[in-house]
Amino acid sequence: MKEFESIINTAWENKDSINGQSDKSILDAINQTIELVDKGELRVAEKNGNEWVVNQWVKKAIMLSFRTHDMDSLSGPYSSWYDKSHLLKGKTANWTKEDHIKAGFRMVPNSPVRKGSFIGKNAVLMPCFVNIGAYVDEGTMVDTWASVGSCAQIGKNCHISGGAGIGGVLEPMQANPTIIEDNCFIGARSEIVEGVIVGEGSVLSMGVFIGQSTKIVYRETGEVIYGKIPPYSVIVPGSIPSKDGKGPALYCAVIIKQVDEKTRSKTSINDLLRD
């Protein structure tokens, strides 16, 4: 692993010259790193105690892979597609029924999952999209038309509701991935982007939008924070009046309370869907 890290970091310094004809050691390091991410044996980010540590070299390997693979086409019964060759067919293109049983997650038709992403056991993928580098942990549901962006990290037993978006890091290029910790509920059509961290057990209502510059306001105290939602927070969309009271109000996210039993009863996952 350390050898891969060293090779990829060196290659990154000369990324403009990297291509499919580069030294075999570089190509092998990139491809094997993506294979390890695909298997869940390596992650773009992992939690160490209370802090998330980003393996920047893994993210670099993913980005370099776009330079080392040529474009290719894929034809289907009703359309054709044109993309980088290592991503065209997706994670499960050559899987047998036994492979699906071993992986242990549900995946309905029209739920593309890209090679180089990992899905944990008992997860449920409705017609959604999971991009390269993403990690979706055990028991999580990604609902219809939701998207999990490149390198995003989703914890255990989360619910990513219909049409929600968890932002990626490849474009625009971000330093850190967006992270949703264990047991979170992300409401329909919400967007969490730009490396924001949603703390464990938090509940976001429908239509909450949070990036690094979004003000997150404690309703009780008026305190404003950025970029990280504390664990077990209940978040709704809100607005902050202009200072002079004449200009337009600006959007914010509001922490209205800590998660309680009433909230949990409304947002708990359904084990019947994960058998």
UniProtKB/Swiss-Prot annotation:
Keyword Acyltransferase on entry: yes
Subcellular location: Cytoplasm
Known EC number: 2.3.1.117
Chain residues that bind substrate: R106, D143
Keywords: Acyltransferase, Amino-acid biosynthesis, Cytoplasm, Diaminopimelate biosynthesis, Lysine biosynthesis, Repeat, Transferase
GO cellular component: cytoplasm
Catalytic activity field: (S)-2,3,4,5-tetrahydrodipicolinate + succinyl-CoA + H2O = (S)-2-succinylamino-6-oxoheptanedioate + CoA
Keyword GTP-binding carried by entry: no
An example Gene Ontology molecular-function term: nucleotidyltransferase activity
Superkingdom to which the source organism belongs: Bacteria
GO biological process, one term: diaminopimelate biosynthetic process
InterPro entries the UniProt entry points to: DapD_Trfase_Hexpep_rpt_fam, Hexapep, THP_succinylTrfase_dom1, THP_succinylTrfase_N_sf, Trimer_LpxA-like_sf
Top class in the EC scheme: transferase
Pathway the protein acts in: Amino-acid biosynthesis; L-lysine biosynthesis via DAP pathway; LL-2,6-diaminopimelate from (S)-tetrahydrodipicolinate (succinylase route): step 1/3
Pfam family for this entry, one: Hexapep_2
Similarity comment: family membership: Belongs to the transferase hexapeptide repeat family.
Subunit structure: Homotrimer.
HAMAP family per record: DapD
The protein's name: 2,3,4,5-tetrahydropyridine-2,6-dicarboxylate N-succinyltransferase
